[in-house]
């Protein structure tokens, strides 16, 4: 938790989910301050993209902005920080990056995302609604503003310039001039080796151009012939859950992720590759397994992320492991794949009281932990 002076006001801001071990990490950055210095002379509809923890939304709540984000956790963080500062949550309208944008905004503020493909998707969506009078300003750490970033703005929207660096942050100013632009596919797609399946990925999905090596290893060691419910936790494009659906014909599969684009990709991949099995599926945008009833799943399959935005962290994995233990039936099993150096074995042993190594190679390990009743 930290205090930030933004737009002439003092705000208390916190990263989300709150985590005592990461109190030193701020929920705002110089790029937020730099952006806010540019907006006081612009009135009208305001769109905010990729506001990680809601610093911009809190500072601009009086404008009733629209906050556009692929991350459900970022929405939860923004709502949390609005409440902490006594601001009505209804003052900000939330929508995901796949929903149509409001027309003719006066002001567009963009925090440049880590994934260039997501930025391209968002700029293409903006191209359909902005006007030459729309003030378009993006911001990032100076080290994250590359020639390729500027070229994308120039190609999709029009005339693009950059600011001087300030507190190691830089601004991108863009004027819409409607340059000629070829159409782009809505998703990236590739063939999954050893199957008849074509995998489709929206822009912000990890490994959108091919199967990542951790998932490839995990696919070789998934459980078969289970009954009940299986969860693909942190499903990404859903390739793990898709294989689980095929290998467990008497089970239901939940695909869940905090990314709207990930869950949309998972749904699309079931619809395109196993359409007859869609009735056995559930798709949920969620913060891990929050709100899921206890003792529900027979098995949970998980490849935990170890980044939150630009920060390296293990609290997401911890949350997933603890949520999995609560949500599994007694005797239910959590299967995890991860880089060897992350030491998930010790974490699972602590959370579950047991852990077994299923398989290992020179980079990854696959582990299994079982929910058992505590001995009295």
From Swiss-Prot:
Its main location: cytoplasm. Specifically methylates the guanine in position 1835 (m2G1835) of 23S rRNA. One of its GO terms (cellular component) is cytoplasm. It catalyses: guanosine(1835) in 23S rRNA + S-adenosyl-L-methionine = N(2)-methylguanosine(1835) in 23S rRNA + S-adenosyl-L-homocysteine + H(+). Belongs to the methyltransferase superfamily. RlmG family. SUPFAM superfamilies: S-adenosyl-L-methionine-dependent methyltransferases (SSF53335). It comes from Klebsiella pneumoniae subsp. pneumoniae (strain ATCC 700721 / MGH 78578). This is Ribosomal RNA large subunit methyltransferase G.
């Amino acid at each position: 938790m930290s205090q930030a002076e933004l737009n002439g006001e003092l705000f208390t801001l916190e990263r989300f989910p709150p985590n005592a071990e990461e109190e030193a990490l701020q929920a705002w950055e110089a790029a937020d301050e730099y952006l806010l210095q540019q907006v006081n002379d612009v009135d009208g509809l305001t769109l905010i993209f990729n506001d990680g923890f809601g610093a911009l939304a809190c500072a601009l709540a009086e404008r009733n902005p629209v906050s556009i984000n692929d991350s459900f956790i970022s929405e939860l963080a923004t709502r949390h920080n609005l409440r902490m500062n006594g601001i009505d949550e209804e003052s900000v309208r939330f929508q995901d990056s796949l929903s149509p944008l409001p027309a003719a905004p006066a002001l567009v503020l963009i925090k440049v995302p880590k994934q260039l493909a997501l930025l391209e998707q968002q700029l293409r969506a903006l191209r359909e609604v902005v006007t030459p009078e729309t003030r378009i300003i993006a911001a990032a750490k100076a080290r994250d503003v590359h020639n390729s970033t500027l070229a994308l703005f120039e190609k999709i929207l029009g005339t693009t310039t950059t600011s001087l660096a300030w507190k190691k942050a830089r601004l991108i100013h863009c004027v819409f001039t409607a340059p000629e632009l070829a159409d782009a596919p809505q998703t990236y797609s590739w063939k999954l080796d050893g199957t008849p399946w074509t995998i489709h990925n929206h822009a912000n999905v990890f490994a959108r151009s091919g199967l990542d090596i951790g998932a490839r290893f995990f696919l070789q060691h998934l459980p078969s012939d289970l009954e009940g419910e299986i969860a693909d936790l942190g499903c990404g494009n859903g390739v793990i859950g898709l294989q689980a659906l095929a290998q467990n014909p008497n089970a239901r599969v939940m695909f869940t992720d905090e990314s709207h684009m990930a869950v949309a990709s998972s749904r699309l991949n079931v619809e395109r590759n196993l359409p007859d099995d869609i009735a056995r599926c559930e798709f949920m945008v969620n913060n891990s397994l929050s709100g899921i009833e206890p003792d529900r799943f027979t098995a949970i399959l998980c490849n935990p992320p170890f980044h939150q935005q630009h920060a390296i962290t293990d609290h997401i994995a911890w949350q997933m492991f603890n949520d999995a233990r609560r949500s599994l039936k007694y005797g239910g099993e959590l299967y995890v794949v991860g880089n060897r150096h992350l030491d998930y074995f010790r974490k699972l042993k602590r959370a579950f009281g047991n852990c077994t190594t299923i398989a290992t190679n020179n980079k990854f390990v696959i582990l299994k932990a079982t929910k058992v009743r505590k001995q009295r």
